[in-house]
Amino acid sequence: MSDHSTFADRHIGLDSQAVATMLAVIGVDSLDDLAVKAVPAGILDTLTDTGAAPGLDSLPPAASEAEALAELRALADANTVAVSMIGQGYYDTHTPPVLLRNIIENPAWYTAYTPYQPEISQGRLEALLNFQTLVTDLTGLEIANASMLDEGTAAAEAMTLMHRAARGPVKRVVVDADVFTQTAAVLATRAKPLGIEIVTADLRAGLPDGEFFGVIAQLPGASGRITDWSALVQQAHDRGALVAVGADLLALTLIAPPGEIGADVAFGTTQRFGVPMGFGGPHAGYLAVHAKHARQLPGRLVGVSVDSDGTPAYRLALQTREQHIRRDKATSNICTAQVLLAVLAAMYASYHGAGGLTAIARRVHAHAEAIAGALGDALVHDKYFDTVLARVPGRADEVLARAKANGINLWRVDADHVSVACDEATTDTHVAVVLDAFGVAAAAPAHTDIATRTSEFLTHPAFTQYRTETSMMRYLRALADKDIALDRSMIPLGSCTMKLNAAAEMESITWPEFGRQHPFAPASDTAGLRQLVADLQSWLVLITGYDAVSLQPNAGSQGEYAGLLAIHEYHASRGEPHRDICLIPSSAHGTNAASAALAGMRVVVVDCHDNGDVDLDDLRAKVGEHAERLSALMITYPSTHGVYEHDIAEICAAVHDAGGQVYVDGANLNALVGLARPGKFGGDVSHLNLHKTFCIPHGGGGPGVGPVAVRAHLAPFLPGHPFAPELPKGYPVSSAPYGSASILPITWAYIRMMGAEGLRAASLTAITSANYIARRLDEYYPVLYTGENGMVAHECILDLRGITKLTGITVDDVAKRLADYGFHAPTMSFPVAGTLMVEPTESESLAEVDAFCEAMIGIRAEIDKVGAGEWPVDDNPLRGAPHTAQCLLASDWDHPYTREQAAYPLGTAFRPKVWPAVRRIDGAYGDRNLVCSCPPVEAFA
């Protein structure tokens, strides 16, 4: 790793000399020696005769960047970029180049993490507040969250939200027959394990008999039909039910929004706001509610608060709803959503403004009217926005073939009906080709007055000031400059794996051959993408030791959910549907418990020892107590305590002996690749985080991809899809067959360029850096957990509880002070309150790791001054952190520390820093005074 001749050498931040330096501090002779000391012998893979790890030895040899890009180009060229007029929730759109260059292709945006440290995340928090304002303005509701995974999962969350809000014994929901097919399928998946009964009906005739807690309708419907649902909403409310409407945001620039007709919830996707179809994703879904249901919302919610100087500031609000706190009682298991795509959609709306969006909508509608006018009596619905449904008895296949011959894909509803969807990219030429396919001549457009909206929208300056490219470019730069992303600094967040997202990995995702593919396009159009999917599935099988992989889950949370559903269906297929107990260690991430609850399982907590390991005696006791009903054990490996538990094989065997399945959470797979395979040491199923281990960027909180990998006996129960007969027959968990398919080339490129040796080296280097940090910082902050040989895995936990007890300085103080030193804080208070979990990853250099250590040592010296009484506990640079440039320029400075100590604690030559945009934020104030849309400009005066 000295001459940087391979991609792996450029991905890994340490050269051979730096590795030797770290190993000397750790006290081991080599990387292999470290692996032997850290990883239990019973699971550590022995290298094959070729020198590669088992499984990985079957991967293709590492390719150069040029070779990998050439192979990706060949895969892209195997696709056909047809004009998509399929619709069904996915539409072509024009991504403004200024947004493509300054957001999607900008590491300042795509390498950031979820804004848990809001003082150094104000830029993307503002962008997300813009997104929430966009959604609330267009839907006519008061509160929207900061994105959902896609429209189908947003619908499922809307259903469970209504069930929680209804607070009654009724477990029936009615779904209109004109809801998108894929949405209905995801709803059915979510409903079954929760015991919710779905009644499907044509709701134009009103509600069917019986009691319901909720009603779900679509606007416009899958057939294109626009229905006035106001009478249905009133009827539902009269019968004690809530109403959720899946609404097209572009259509809502013209038609009355759900909130104005009385609906309680709106859900959908923002895909057509500048986000490519991408063979299914990623796209930002949305969910909006009335303010009284705000605490029922799932996922992230950005709110306005104030900092310690009284300045308005943004933060994540109402976090007590979320899985990392409420575990199996959470509103949802969602963590990562689609922040990067939400930012893109928000800026698309800002760039076009209300007038521009309305003009696009009118143009789309005009093209639909032109087609409808020519179809005449063949037209099925007389009110539509963008999608026209035509009756063509026995001719559907002929019409599709004629359009396809001229480069346009239409949608076959059945043998007698074809639908045509217009979008932002539709032209008069496309309309002419469509009419020719139907065999009709152009005629006068069928003018339909659908403009029932009277309320204004997007009047805030965020949507009126940035119409020129110059102003938008500068706005995006100004926002990015407020944040710490990987382009500025190491982000040592434990359990998050903030590694390099290489430019060569990212390059192909903007190619139209990948981006402009409809997820339901003919298979002949997507041969290259399908080969890429097959490659990736086979490589992940080799890496994990499992037998099959589904790439459909579009987040780690959904991978967990899919894996647990597969386990449940497996037990049911064996005549044991009663197996519903899920054992989860007390140290587990809250998502595990939330996912188990969504899968209809009952969580039983297994105790852990003081060293973090699972208490085997308690595990055996719980297994024995629940043997007849035991469904699964969920266990993270390496553990959430940052160590390799040496009893993992025994733990798995105990569960298997009782008829249970073992779910190995793959969140920490970056410490296993090339060293041990969960499918070989006892796991039956794992989800993987491609946005952690395999280089898909975090995007400030999404997109993510959470494939689920299983042993052969669970493979038949992997997610299926109503429009993908090639998939297994399991239940779909995402709207698209292959989830967020357009970002899969990132992981494909990473594996292809790293090869077997590079992948193993990445794991070993990550472990080396973590152990080096543990050794350097242990005398200042005790390392809470180590394995049997005194080693950690790829992350370490620094214990500040004793420091807090002695000095009053908290983990929050240290996290905020790190911003003054130019660093993003590690993970706070997980898995143990009062601690920091540090994960350096393999991509960081020795210089960067040393700088982080020096910052932490400098902070410890400051803490000692507080402990010695030199600085009072309520007025010191830690409690005052972070310090903005504005506060340092104040005429009055009455603190016992200097301005220089506040701003540059290790001197101006230490490292470049991102100045925090605000002082420490008052979280409680923001939750008490909930504001989740753009505040007026006067608030900042």
UniProtKB/Swiss-Prot annotation:
Signal peptide: none annotated. One of its GO terms (biological process) is glycine decarboxylation via glycine cleavage system. One of its GO terms (cellular component) is glycine cleavage complex. It catalyses: N(6)-[(R)-lipoyl]-L-lysyl-[glycine-cleavage complex H protein] + glycine + H(+) = N(6)-[(R)-S(8)-aminomethyldihydrolipoyl]-L-lysyl-[glycine-cleavage complex H protein] + CO2. Its cofactor is pyridoxal 5'-phosphate. Its EC number is 1.4.4.2. InterPro entries: GcvP, GDC-P_C, GDC-P_N, GDC_P, PyrdxlP-dep_Trfase, PyrdxlP-dep_Trfase_major, PyrdxlP-dep_Trfase_small. It holds the Pfam family GcvP2_C. The modification N6-(pyridoxal phosphate)lysine is found at K692. The glycine cleavage system catalyzes the degradation of glycine. The P protein binds the alpha-amino group of glycine through its pyridoxal phosphate cofactor; CO(2) is released and the remaining methylamine moiety is then transferred to the lipoamide cofactor of the H protein. The glycine cleavage system is composed of four proteins: P, T, L and H. PANTHER family: GLYCINE DEHYDROGENASE (DECARBOXYLATING), MITOCHONDRIAL, GLYCINE DEHYDROGENASE, DECARBOXYLATING. Belongs to the GcvP family. This is Probable glycine dehydrogenase (decarboxylating). It comes from Mycobacterium tuberculosis (strain ATCC 25618 / H37Rv). The lineage of its organism: Bacteria, Bacillati, Actinomycetota, Actinomycetes, Mycobacteriales.
